[in-house]
C-alpha cells in the first residue's frame, strides 16, 4: 500500500501521495478522504493525489457554516496556494463543491470529473423531497447507527457488496457527529449554480451511474448549458468509486488521458 502523507491546512485535513500533476479528490456527504484510498493507490504513480476532508467531515474543522459555497471556499484557499491547477474529482456533495470551486477559482481548475453530481439541489419532485426528509427522519428518530445501516443498504445493496457496506457503516458512525451531519444536510436545499454553468470553459466529465438517485435525463438537463462536457453512464449505484474501484479507476484514467 502506498503511504499517504496526512497534514492540516486552513482547518482542512488532507491526505496526499505521489508527485506530478495535481489530482484533487472531494468526497460525498458523510464520507471522508479515507474513501479515496483506491484512487490514491492507483493514481499516485503519475499524479500528486490529494484527498481532502471537507469542513464538517473527517479530521477537518467541525464549525459551521456548512453551505456549499463555504465548503468550496475552504478548498479554494488551499488550492490557491498550490503552484499548479488541478483536475478536480467530486462525488455527489463533492461534485457540488467542485463546481463551486471552479466558479470561485477558475484559473486553478484544469478540469472536472463529476460523479453522480448535481448543478442544483432544489427538491422539486415528491420523490426527491421524500428521500431528503427520510434521511432527516432516520437521523432525528433513530440516530447515527441506524442511519448508517439504512444508508449502507441504499448505497451498497446486495450480498456481493457486503464487505463495502460494512466498511461504510463503520466509518460513517466513527467520523460523523449527529449535529454536524444534520447541519450539512439541512444546508443543501436551495443550492444552485445551474445558471452559471455557461461560464465554465474547462472540460467537464459527467459520470451518471445506471442506478443513481437522479435519472439520467434529469442530470443531462441540469448540465445542458456546460460548453465543454462529456457524459459517461457506467453500471453502478450512487457511491460508484467505492462500489467498483477498478471500474471507476479505469474510466477516470481514460478521462484524464483524453485531456
Protein language model regions, located:
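Conserved loop-alpha-helix segment in the C-terminal half of the alpha/beta-hydrolase fold
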Residues: 203-236, 242
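Active-site loop/oxyanion-hole signature of alpha/beta-hydrolase fold enzymes
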Residues: 38-41, 50-89, 250
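Flexible "cap/lid" loop of the alpha/beta hydrolase fold
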Residues: 103, 110-141
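Gly/Ala-rich beta-loop-alpha elbow adjacent to hydrolase catalytic centers
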Residues: 90-94, 98
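Alpha/beta-hydrolase fold catalytic core
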Residues: 1-23, 45-48, 83, 110, ...
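Conserved HGGG/HGGXW glycine-rich cap/lid loop of the alpha/beta-hydrolase fold
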Residues: 12-61
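Conserved alpha/beta-hydrolase catalytic His-Asp/Glu region
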Residues: 123-127, 142-198
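Active-site signature of alpha/beta-hydrolase-fold catalytic machinery across serine-
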Residues: 38, 100-104
Amino acid at each position: 500500500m502506498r503511504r499517504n502523507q496526512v497534514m492540516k491546512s486552513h482547518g482542512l485535513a488532507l491526505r496526499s501521495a505521489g508527485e506530478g500533476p495535481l489530482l484533487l479528490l472531494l468526497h460525498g456527504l458523510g464520507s471522508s478522504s479515507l474513501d479515496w484510498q483506491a484512487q490514491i493507490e492507483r493514481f499516485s504513480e503519475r499524479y500528486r493525489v490529494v484527498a481532502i476532508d471537507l469542513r464538517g467531515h473527517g479530521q477537518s474543522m467541525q464549525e459551521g457554516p456548512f453551505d456549499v459555497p463555504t465548503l468550496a471556499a475552504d478548498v479554494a484557499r488551499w488550492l490557491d496556494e498550490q503552484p499548479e491547477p488541478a483536475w478536480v474529482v467530486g462525488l455527489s456533495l463533492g461534485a457540488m463543491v467542485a463546481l463551486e470551486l471552479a466558479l470561485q477559482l477558475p484559473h486553478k481548475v484544469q478540469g472536472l470529473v463529476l460523479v453522480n453530481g448535481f448543478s442544483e439541489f432544489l427538491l422539486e419532485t415528491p420523490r426527491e423531497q421524500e428521500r431528503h426528509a427520510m434521511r432527516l427522519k432516520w437521523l432525528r428518530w433513530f440516530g447515527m447507527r441506524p442511519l448508517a445501516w439504512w444508508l449502507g443498504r441504499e448505497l451498497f445493496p446486495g450480498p456481493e457488496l457486503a464487505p463495502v457496506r460494512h466498511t461504510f457503516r463503520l466509518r460513517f458512525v466513527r467520523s460523523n457527529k449527529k449535529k454536524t451531519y444534520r447541519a450539512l444536510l439541512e444546508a443543501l436545499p436551495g443550492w444552485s449554480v445551474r445558471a452559471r454553468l455557461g461560464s465554465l470553459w474547462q472540460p467537464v466529465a459527467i459520470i451518471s451511474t445506471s442506478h443513481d438517485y437522479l435519472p439520467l435525463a434529469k442530470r443531462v438537463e441540469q448540465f445542458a448549458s456546460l460548453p465543454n462536457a462529456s457524459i459517461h453512464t457506467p453500471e453502478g449505484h450512487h457511491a460508484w468509486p467505492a462500489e467498483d474501484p477498478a471500474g471507476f479507476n479505469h474510466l477516470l484514467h481514460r478521462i484524464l488521458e483524453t485531456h
